[in-house]
Amino acid sequence: VQLSPLGTTGLQVSQVALGTAPLGGGLFGDCDEQQAERVVHEALDLGITLVDTSPYYGDAEERLGRALRGGRRDRVVLATKAGRYGSDDFDVSAARIRSSLQRSLDLLRTDHVDVFQLHDVEFVPLEQIREVAVPALLALREEGLVRAVGVTGYPVETICALVEEFDLDVVLTYAHATLLDDSLMTRVLPVAEANGTAVMNAAAVSLGLLTPSGGSMAADHPASPVIREAAAAVVALCQREGVDVAQLANQYSIQRSGAATTVIGTRKPANVRAAVEAAGEPIDEELLAEVLALRPPADQRTWPAGGWRG
């Protein structure tokens, strides 16, 4: 897997990162510890060097900590988060951020994390993020307790505003470098690059819309009918051409986003292998052009997330 610098942090990260939300069980579906360990070990064996987790992801941190025993911790850039602890459980106070870091260190069986981010900032009033949470992160970095700090979230406007206001090392945003939307490339990257901030990309398949079964989840997906209709057209085109739409979506997002890394979350070792293959396989440019011609109705459109109404 190709490595690239994570902005100015001095960290080198793989083009594909492993997302551990599906490994924690609970809200994110069934996954036992043995299955989680197989996925982590497969990722490391394939050359993935960045693993992304969070207290919000059920048992993911604890399972990841056990999976990284035996010297494996030294092989990864470990990223975790604070601020979100459940579907409706948010706390961005300085004390909770600090105690959350300590709990994560204990569960992950490590004495440091490389990347520490606020999780889903759009669910908390922005003044709390600006006045309390980000300063708490910066203090932890100043004390040497974490190497790099940043924020994660969906709304492009919020992410860009925080990048411009604070000395953030990295940001993560999702579903904005897809076959449906290139906001990461056109809006986030220019601001991030101007401020020396690295960008992590996620949700290449647009939270499931760009999969063969994407249509079946439409009722539960936050996207508007316009976005869902564009996704259905992309899925139908790929099916007619005999192409796995999810693999094309991963190819495009990994290879064309311009982000330092693209986080792929899965509970299946085969999907980890497919993501690594997507990073290196040549894209069918003719098919991609046809797919992107279906994008305009959905491009730059967003869905509600937290306090952000889209």
Describe the residue ranges of each PLM region:
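Conserved, mostly hydrophobic/aromatic
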Residues: L6, L18, A36, V51, ...
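Active-site mouth loops of central-metabolism enzymes
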Residues: P22-E33, A82-R96
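Structural preference for beta-strand elements that scaffold enzyme active sites
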Residues: V13-A17, T49-L50, Y56, R75-A79, ...
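N-terminal binding-site loop/beta-alpha segment at the start of enzyme catalytic domains
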Residues: V1-V76
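Acidic (Asp/Glu)-rich catalytic clusters
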Residues: T8, G65-R73, L105-R109, L162-F166, ...
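Beta/alpha (TIM)-barrel catalytic core signal, keyed to glycine-rich beta->alpha loops juxtaposed to Asp/Glu
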Residues: V121-G310
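Active-site groove signature of glycoside hydrolases
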Residues: L105-V124
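Short, acidic/polar
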Residues: D30-A43, V92-L108, P155-A161
